């Protein structure tokens, strides 16, 4: 498996992936025109022709037969072209000494606080390929790209995680809150956002703080929680240094997690090594390896052995990277458990 930049030839495969995501993955709508537009912008970003606020680095996971089975992306900066909304989960305190009453009420504040940060987004792996190292490669490959081209990204990375919804796409949070203001199904609002029609959010979203005690018990219970299918991705990002700081999605209340870019494990511990081609040996461990290129970027995960400034890999790994012995690579142990 390799992770590489998307190309226009991948559009049919992207449409098929988008159709299988279900609701809740806003940035990957099953809309051919929107996906074609996004691929075009991604190609510009990899060529260095996009401003940071427009840069959308879209990657695909491809097997050795050339089949695209997954997708992930990095947005250079959010909210610089149109407002970026989250709810900040805060606290409102009311008290009366005379009545001996003290109440602390969790409150949702509409916020644009995460504007300007880079974002990890659009992570999706086909169900038939959710095994082995594939998920870790697809998600963590982005960190090596950021480490190699650090100047393209902000000092903080965020990731909006998919919130709770049932098999029919029903979101408890949306049913208790959003539906009253938008008068549409959660799936429709999710789709409109994904195809770039975001003006309705600013026009219809309530601007005043919202006391969560007015929401249903079910809705309150999903604030800051992820969809079960998203739990592995959340655990992976937490292992890299991400944490929840009280921001949630305005539609499904899924958590927006964040980390300082330079403190993310795979970025901070990655290093440039000289590629050696041979037999890694019994003491090899899984490494994430990047060929240090931008437009012709290739990233893979494979057993490797680092020693004395070199990284020993087998011939197939070198072939996947499109490199020969003596080339420079950026590499890091694949899993956070290997740190140190």
Swiss-Prot record:
One annotated GO biological process: arginine catabolic process
Keywords for the protein's UniProt record, in alphabetical order: Acyltransferase, Arginine metabolism, Transferase
Q: Which GO terms describe its molecular function?
A: arginine N-succinyltransferase activity; N-succinylarginine dihydrolase activity
Q: From the UniProt record, list the reaction(s) this protein catalyses.
A: succinyl-CoA + L-arginine = N(2)-succinyl-L-arginine + CoA + H(+)
Query: Which InterPro entries did the record assign?
Result: Acyl_CoA_acyltransferase, Arg_succinylTrfase_AstA/AruG, Arginine_N-succinylTrfase
Question: Where does this protein act, in terms of pathway?
Answer: Amino-acid degradation; L-arginine degradation via AST pathway; L-glutamate and succinate from L-arginine: step 1/5
Subunit notes for this chain? Heterotetramer of two alpha and two beta subunits.
Q: Which family does it belong to?
A: Belongs to the succinylarginine dihydrolase family.
Q: What is this protein called?
A: Arginine N-succinyltransferase subunit beta
Organism, as annotated: Pseudomonas aeruginosa (strain ATCC 15692 / DSM 22644 / CIP 104116 / JCM 14847 / LMG 12228 / 1C / PRS 101 / PAO1)
> Which gene name belongs to this protein?
aruG
């Amino acid at each position: 498996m390799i992770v590489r930049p998307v190309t226009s030839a991948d559009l049919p495969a992207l449409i098929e992936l988008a159709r299988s995501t279900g609701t809740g993955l806003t940035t990957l709508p099953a809309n051919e025109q929107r996906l074609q537009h996004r691929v075009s912008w991604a190609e510009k970003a990899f060529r260095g022709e996009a401003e940071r606020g427009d840069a959308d680095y879209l990657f695909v996971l491809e097997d050795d037969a050339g089949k695209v089975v997954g997708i992930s992306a990095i947005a250079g900066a959010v909210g610089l072209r149109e407002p970026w909304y989250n709810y900040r989960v805060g606290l409102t305190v009311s008290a009366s000494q005379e009545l001996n009453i003290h109440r602390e009420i969790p409150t949702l504040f509409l916020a644009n606080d995460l504007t300007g940060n880079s974002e990890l987004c659009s992570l999706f792996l086909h169900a038939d390929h959710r095994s082995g190292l594939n998920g870790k490669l697809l998600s963590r490959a982005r960190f090596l790209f950021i480490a190699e081209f650090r100047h393209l990204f902000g000092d903080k990375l965020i990731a909006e995680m998919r919130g709770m919804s049932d098999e029919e796409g029903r979101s408890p949070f949306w049913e208790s809150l959003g539906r009253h203001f938008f008068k549409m199904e959660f799936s429709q609002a999710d789709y409109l956002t994904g195809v770039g029609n975001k003006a309705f959010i600013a026009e219809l979203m309530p601007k005043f703080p919202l006391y969560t005690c007015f929401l249903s018990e079910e809705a309150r219970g999903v604030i800051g929680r992820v969809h079960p299918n998203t739990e592995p991705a959340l655990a992976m990002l937490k292992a890299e240094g991400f944490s929840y700081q009280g921001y949630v999605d305005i539609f499904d209340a899924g958590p927006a997690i964040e980390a300082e870019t330079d403190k993310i494990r795979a970025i901070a511990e990655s290093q440039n090594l000289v590629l050696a081609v041979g037999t890694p040996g019994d003491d090899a461990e899984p490494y994430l390896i990047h060929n240090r290129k931008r437009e012709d970027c290739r990233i893979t995960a494979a057993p490797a052995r680092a020693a004395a400034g070199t990284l020993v890999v087998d011939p197939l790994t070198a072939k996947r990277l499109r490199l020969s012995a003596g080339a420079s690579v950026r590499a890091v142990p694949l899993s956070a458990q290997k740190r140190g």
